[in-house]
């Protein structure tokens, strides 16, 4: 079954910018994240979205994809290789193998016994706003394929060892001859008995079933840096899967941030809080205390401050994930609507409204109480 187009998966055009691709990825990955979306196909969609983003967010991979699609251009004509044929029957045409190497991908068949690196692992971590802002140390468990401790990766039962495959005699390939009008052609294919390794395991390890690998859940300790952004990827070197006779690969931790604090919003390193004050305090000015995630901070409210005004506290925001400096905190002022007024208070407000003020000239069509209602209208 052919894979869907990566641009179609993310819902962006082929001319989309990296920022548009990143925005679409964040939106879709949150929607289909298995921890949030309980639909049966959510995990598969999430994997599909991640794969599309990994390609389209990388300039080199994206250019390759735009040119060749999802097929590997190095495969030539359906993976046809010169190694599959012995052209020895054409003794008078010594250059034919070179020609086939040129046109059909060339290259020798990969040695199945050659060292192979393990796989990179990915772990998705959900963070609260506080954890993303201040960092977090925690233990995580990841599924991983590791070397079997019973046979030490040989796949053979302890006390025995792999033998030379009796079918291919250790070559890893089986040859069949075919006569044609053009001469003799020898077709080589991977030995189905040993899988191309050239070795035959007569008594397999009962722990790993002869594969030399076992699946385990591995616990590792990770440190999430303060100031990590939503959707940012953290690399943990040397903790991925162990390869065959080579070292470990990496783990990539993908962060998703879910704020439990309804009055907070974060953009990059900017921290935004809402400060609710009574009407008289805004009219006359005051010193207030903002309650951000770092604790109480003193804040000077100028006289005549309007609801919706944003006040900046420099260096009181989220730490920089790279370890230097802090962002700014922005406090948005909101007026607290009085719910119960005495007759005297109502009369004073009417008198205040009749007196007017300089602000009335900027909005001649809004009465005072209309402004108050507008100021306290719930935000959508």
Swiss-Prot record:
Name the needed cofactors: Zn(2+)
Which source organism does the UniProt entry give?
Geobacillus stearothermophilus (Bacillus stearothermophilus)
What are the J domain coordinates in residue numbering? 5-69
What's the protein here called? Chaperone protein DnaJ
Instruction: Return the CXXCXGXG motif repeat spans.
Output: 148-155, 165-172, 191-198, 205-212
Annotated Gene Ontology MF terms?
ATP binding; heat shock protein binding; unfolded protein binding; zinc ion binding
Q: Which SUPFAM superfamilies match?
A: Chaperone J-domain (SSF46565), DnaJ/Hsp40 cysteine-rich domain (SSF57938), HSP40/DnaJ peptide-binding domain (SSF49493)
Function noted in UniProt:
Participates actively in the response to hyperosmotic and heat shock by preventing the aggregation of stress-denatured proteins and by disaggregating proteins, also in an autonomous, DnaK-independent fashion. Unfolded proteins bind initially to DnaJ; upon interaction with the DnaJ-bound protein, DnaK hydrolyzes its bound ATP, resulting in the formation of a stable complex. GrpE releases ADP from DnaK; ATP binding to DnaK triggers the release of the substrate protein, thus completing the reaction cycle.
Q: Where in the cell is it found?
A: Cytoplasm
